[in-house]
């Protein structure tokens, strides 16, 4: 199971390059600490143009160890000071955790299209069965479906495919 932490920001007008460079700098620092981190751009929908910072961990134990590593680092203190002194973006979606419930993230499939569904928790077994059917259809056209469920956030009834 992969645990993903995400944070989505909207760059201030004229500061998109600065924000992207700041995020790439943090991504490198996380990599130096042994943490897998990525920056992506939202292309469609209400958050088009936003940047997403994501980290990936194999399980919750690793994810929490990574959080502890980051928050106790000197690098993170510098990032916080930079955010206070020269903000280059506004937070659109604060830091949240999701987990992979079915499928797997693959580096060969770098473009993602999220569909969000509101689902009662007691319907999750049915969704898992349907996911296997969707996965079979997607394999025919080289699409890699992944089912994500929220761990934190506003609405824990959402699933992401």
Predicted regions and their residues:
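A short, glycine/Asx- and small/polar-enriched loop/turn
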Residues: 47-51, 154-157
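Active-site-flanking beta-strand signature of metal-NTP-handling nucleotidyl enzymes
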Residues: 2-10, 52-54, 111-117
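An amphipathic, aromatic/His-enriched active-site/gating alpha helix that lines ligand/cofactor pockets
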Residues: 17-39, 44-47, 56-93, 129-147, ...
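Short, surface-exposed ligand-recognition loops at beta-strand->loop->(often short) alpha-helix junctions
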Residues: 10-20, 118-128
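Conserved small/polar residues in nucleotide/adenosyl-binding loops
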Residues: 159-161
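Solvent-exposed loop and beta-edge segments used for protein-protein assembly and interaction
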Residues: 1, 47, 107-109
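Surface-exposed beta-loop interaction hotspot
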Residues: 89-124
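Short, flexible beta-strand-to-coil junctions
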Residues: 8-12, 57-58, 120, 151-152
């Amino acid at each position: 199971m992969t645990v993903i932490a995400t944070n989505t920001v909207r760059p201030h007008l004229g500061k998109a390059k600065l924000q992207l460079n700041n995020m790439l700098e943090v991504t490198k620092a996380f990599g130096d600490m042994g943490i897998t981190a990525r920056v992506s751009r939202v292309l469609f929908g209400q958050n088009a143009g936003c940047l997403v910072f994501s980290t990936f961990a194999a399980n919750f134990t690793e994810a929490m160890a990574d959080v502890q590593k980051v928050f106790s680092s000197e690098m993170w203190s510098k990032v916080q000071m930079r955010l206070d002194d020269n903000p280059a973006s506004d937070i659109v979606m604060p830091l949240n955790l999701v987990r992979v419930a079915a499928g797997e993230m693959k580096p060969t499939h770098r473009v993602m299209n999220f569909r969000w569904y509101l689902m009662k928790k007691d319907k999750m077994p049915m969704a898992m069965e349907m996911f296997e059917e969707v996965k079979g259809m997607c394999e025919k056209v080289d699409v890699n479906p992944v089912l994500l469920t929220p761990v934190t956030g506003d609405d824990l009834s959402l699933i992401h495919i």
